[in-house]
Every structure is written in structure tokens, then in C-alpha cells.
């Protein structure tokens, strides 16, 4: 559906949900305010009610779908709750390479929490950095279109983005 088209218009999440568009690969960079709000919900189901990513999932359950959430490591628990609320199964955490040996505190470092659904894909690819362009490159290599980036403005062919 999105082949040979360039999507770079800013759309609010509520409008995107009403559009009935569906995505197989979603990258989310939540704001600190969103993280704080989700942390205080009494049920993880409330996350999807507040932020209805489940409404955007691809309809074909035979296609691999993934959701990548970039957060500080101290928010891994909330990210996994988000994946569960949105119907994704937690797969892995991708953390930056550490210059020190041994166990180090990553709580203030950005990590990528990855979840999936549908037919599984096993990959051993790494991500160059936590920059949006590198996240997009990784998602294109590991995921399926259509693609959605939530939380930042991106200007990438065949990607739609959503702010707010």
C-alpha cells in the first residue's frame, strides 16, 4: 500500500487511529510525561486506552510485526507493560556497548525494548546507535512495512510519523 510513496506528514495519534491505517513495524519514543503517566496507571490495560497502539497493528497475524520502544533503562518495566498492553510479546533489550568491563549502571542510558507478534523472525543484527536514523535502518532490516515512527519528526521514504 505504501510502496513508492513518501509519507512525512505529521499526524496526531487520535487521528491516525481513526484513519484505520495499520502498521507492521512501529517505533515509539515516549516523552517523560507519557512514561510518568503510564507508570501511575492501576492496570496495564489503561496504557492502550490512553495510547491506542493496538488499534494500529497489522491485521494479518501471519506477518511478523514488531514494536520498538526507546526509553532510558530505568523505564524498562514500563516499556514491557506497554508491549503487553498493546499485544506484543517482549523479545529483547538492546543496550549500548559499555567501555567498562563488569556490571555497570545503565539506568540513565537509552535502550531499545523490542516486542513482536505474528510469525517470528530471528535476527542477530545490532544497531549502530540510539539515533532515530539508526533505529529506522534496523527496523527496515528486521521488520515489515508499513512503518510508523511515533514521537519524533522523521523524513524517511515509506515511513509515516506521529507526534503527540
Predicted regions and their residues:
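Class I S-adenosyl-L-methionine-dependent methyltransferase catalytic core
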Residues: 1-164
Amino acid at each position: 500500500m505504501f510502496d513508492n510513496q513518501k509519507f512525512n506528514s505529521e499526524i496526531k495519534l487520535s487521528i491516525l487511529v481513526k484513519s484505520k491505517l495499520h502498521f507492521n513495524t512501529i517505533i515509539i519514543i515516549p516523552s517523560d510525561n507519557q512514561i510518568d503517566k503510564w507508570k501511575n496507571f492501576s492496570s496495564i490495560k489503561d496504557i492502550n486506552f490512553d495510547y491506542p497502539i493496538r488499534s494500529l497493528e497489522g491485521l494479518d497475524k501471519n506477518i511478523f510485526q514488531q514494536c520498538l520502544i526507546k526509553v532510558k533503562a530505568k523505564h524498562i518495566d514500563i516499556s514491557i507493560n506497554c508491549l503487553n498492553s498493546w499485544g506484543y510479546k517482549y523479545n529483547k533489550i538492546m543496550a549500548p556497548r559499555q567501555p567498562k568491563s563488569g556490571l555497570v549502571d545503565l539506568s540513565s542510558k537509552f535502550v531499545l525494548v523490542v516486542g513482536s507478534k505474528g510469525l517470528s523472525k530471528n535476527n542477530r543484527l545490532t544497531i549502530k546507535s540510539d539515533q532515530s536514523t539508526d533505529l529506522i535502518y534496523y527496523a527496515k532490516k528486521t521488520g515489515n512495512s508499513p512503518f510508523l515512527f511515533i514521537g519524533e519528526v522523521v523524513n524517511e521514504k515509506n515511513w509515516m510519523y506521529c507526534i503527540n
